[in-house]
């Protein structure tokens, strides 16, 4: 299946990153190379881009798409949580901009055999990096009922989490749960008929939760944000695109902590903790897709862009 990728919030992201000729940029989730190609165009003639992705298919597609840019591009197969290690290994110095486009690509959803989609019957996998040992099948067949319920509740924000976990454990006693189709039917049976008619596909939240757990997406995001800030030069920018509230909450809270790290009691007239701001927001509010973009690319509807600029040591956030 050909890898297709429509970059969301493309112009808004380029503005947030303030891409300039000759700059050095890191695309932490290079995917099909849509954002990366635009960064390379805007940073011509000698701007450099390092593209990371843990999905070998995505990296192959990015390599094909970005081939015309020659040695201005370096692609590395790794999770973006290792961005600082990659920068060190490549002797990169400081980057002018870092982009993180979080979540599963359109291609991964559409590629049935990976197990991300509840619309295709496929082996229960859900790994973005297929060298990792934990699969969705391992999770649903081997984890304790309470832990499965916690994952579905916390990562899927699913109110029927306990009931779904109970039905999963009951079903696996009869035979192993090996396909997405089996799991979808179990979820449908667990959710009362009246509730199944609300809020889209009944398996959506559970599939999201299991995918997040299998790939440790939220932990990787927290580590990746810290690594991205570390590799930026003062004045460099970090732009992050998220697609659901759990990810956006982590980004929002992290950016707020960087802007106001002071831990002094609020009634203290002068800061004595010595924790200076690390970054400040590029825009006052998060950026979302326009009506025209949503019409052209419905998956952009849930996208949220936040960006910060790294401050000089001791510089005050505005």
UniProtKB/Swiss-Prot annotation:
One of its GO terms (cellular component) is cytoplasm. Disulfide bonds: none annotated. One of its GO terms (molecular function) is rRNA (cytosine-N4-)-methyltransferase activity. It holds the Pfam family Methyltransf_5. GO terms for biological process: rRNA base methylation. InterPro entries: RsmH, SAM-dep_MeTrfase_MraW_recog, SAM-dependent_MTases_sf. Its EC number is 2.1.1.199. The keyword Acyltransferase does not apply. The keyword S-adenosyl-L-methionine applies. It comes from the Bacteria. S-adenosyl-L-methionine binds at residues 33-35, 53, 80, 101, 108. Keywords: Cytoplasm, Methyltransferase, rRNA processing, S-adenosyl-L-methionine, Transferase. It catalyses: cytidine(1402) in 16S rRNA + S-adenosyl-L-methionine = N(4)-methylcytidine(1402) in 16S rRNA + S-adenosyl-L-homocysteine + H(+). It is an enzyme of class 2 (transferase). It is found in: Cytoplasm. Specifically methylates the N4 position of cytidine in position 1402 (C1402) of 16S rRNA. PANTHER family: 12S RRNA N4-METHYLCYTIDINE METHYLTRANSFERASE, S-ADENOSYL-METHYLTRANSFERASE MRAW. Belongs to the methyltransferase superfamily. RsmH family. This is Ribosomal RNA small subunit methyltransferase H. It comes from Symbiobacterium thermophilum (strain DSM 24528 / JCM 14929 / IAM 14863 / T).
